[in-house]
Structure formats: structure tokens, C-alpha cells
């Protein structure tokens, strides 16, 4: 995918259509090339956004919905990655979005992030998590956690096994525990128990 994205830029980002830029932004976010993704979204806003906020295929011509849908999808890719038992916050956050908030993000695993706020200049991230079922998950931050609170109570830090941000290195066992890369600890992750129908609010201070 990375090589394909590089080849796509052979003729320059200026040669890419509106929907192509949205596609590039999504691919870049998943590959954690946050600045390329942000560059693609910025070009959509500068050249492919009509006065009514619809997007177009060519610059200023021919309405096409693709970039509208792809734009919002790319923003979500920058803010959250999820799979069953694993949520990663701000996996591809560009410098241009160093502070912000998002609400009502539906994640895989029957989880909703009812509120997500971040201020990377202050190294602060807060999130409110709502689960549709009793479960235990891993929650990963963009860098090492200095301290954190759950529902206003300060928590003890723990070192969990797992290699970087690769979700493939995290496996949930039948007893509800997790296995990861042997001998490798990740200070950017916590284990979180969630109750069905209950909201859990977390506040993180990052290193």
C-alpha cells in the first residue's frame, strides 16, 4: 500500500481528482502518514469544495459525493482505529489538528466514543467510552502514558505486552486475558474493563 501511494504521487498531488484525494487521505491515515493525509484533505478544501460544501470531481466542476464521504472517513481514520478488543486513539493525528474534539464515534466491538478531546500541546487526551456489552479491551494512546484517571480516580500505570501500535501483536485469550509480543512492553496502552450500558470517562496525561 505504501508503494502504491508513492506511485500515485508520481505526477504530483495537483493531478489527483477530488475523489482520488479522499482515497489518498484514507490510505495515508491507515498507513499513519498523517501529514500526507492532511495535505490531501487541505487540497480538497482549497480546490474541490463548492460554496454549498458539496465536493466536485474536477476543480470547481461536476458535483461528486465521493470526496464528501471520503473526507469524513479520513478524519475518522486519523482519530480512531478499532477492532474487537482493541481501540487506538489518534493513530494518525497531523500537526494541523493538534487540538480538537469529536463526538459519537462508533467503534468495532460494540463501543461508542461519546466524546473524544485532545490537546497535544498540553499532552492531554480525554475520552468517554460507552459499551453495549460487558467486555475488556486494550486502549492505546499515541505515545507513552505519564498518568491517567478513570472516572476521576487516579490509576496505577501498568506495562502491557504488545509491539508498538500493531494490533496483530495483540490477541485476546479465552479467559479474557491478552497475549502479545514476548519480552516487549508498551507504555502507551492500558487494559480497560467496560460494563454494559455504562459510560467510562478517562483522562490521560502523555509523556
Question: How would you name each of these model-derived features?
Answer:
Residues 130-144:
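Surface-exposed beta-strand/loop patches in extracellular or lumenal glycoproteins
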Residues 87-95, 167-172:
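Short, basic/low-complexity N-terminal boundary segments at the transition from targeting/disordered tails
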Residues 1-87, 97-100, 123-125:
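Active-site core of glycosidic bond-cleaving carbohydrate-active enzymes
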Residues 112-113, 155-157:
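Short, isolated positions in well-ordered beta-strands
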Residues 23, 36, 155, 166-169, ...:
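Substrate-binding groove of N-acetylhexosamine-processing glycoside hydrolases
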Residues 139, 161-207:
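C-terminal beta-strand-rich structural cap/linker in extracellular carbohydrate-active enzymes
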Residues 89-134:
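Surface beta-strand/loop "capping" patches
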Amino acid at each position: 500500500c505504501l508503494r502504491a501511494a508513492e506511485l500515485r504521487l508520481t505526477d504530483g498531488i495537483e493531478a489527483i481528482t477530488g475523489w482520488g484525494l479522499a482515497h489518498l487521505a484514507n490510505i495515508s491515515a491507515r498507513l499513519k502518514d498523517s501529514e500526507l493525509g492532511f495535505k490531501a484533505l487541505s487540497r480538497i478544501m482549497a480546490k474541490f469544495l463548492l460554496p454549498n460544501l458539496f465536493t466536485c470531481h474536477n476543480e470547481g466542476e461536476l458535483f461528486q459525493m465521493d470526496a464528501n464521504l471520503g473526507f469524513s472517513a479520513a478524519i475518522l481514520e486519523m482519530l480512531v482505529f478499532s477492532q474487537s478488543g482493541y481501540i487506538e486513539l489518534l493513530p494518525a493525528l497531523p500537526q494541523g489538528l493538534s487540538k480538537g474534539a469529536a463526538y459519537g464515534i462508533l467503534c468495532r466491538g460494540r463501543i461508542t466514543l461519546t466524546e473524544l478531546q485532545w490537546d497535544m500541546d498540553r499532552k492531554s487526551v480525554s475520552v468517554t467510552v460507552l459499551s453495549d456489552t460487558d467486555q475488556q479491551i486494550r486502549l492505546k494512546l499515541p505515545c507513552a502514558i505519564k498518568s491517567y484517571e478513570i472516572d476521576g480516580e487516579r490509576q496505577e500505570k501498568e506495562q502491557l505486552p504488545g509491539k508498538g501500535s500493531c494490533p496483530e501483536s495483540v490477541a485476546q485469550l479465552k479467559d479474557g486475558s491478552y497475549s502479545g509480543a514476548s519480552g516487549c512492553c508498551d507504555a502507551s496502552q492500558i487494559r480497560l474493563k467496560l460494563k454494559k450500558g455504562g459510560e467510562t470517562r478517562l483522562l490521560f496525561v502523555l509523556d
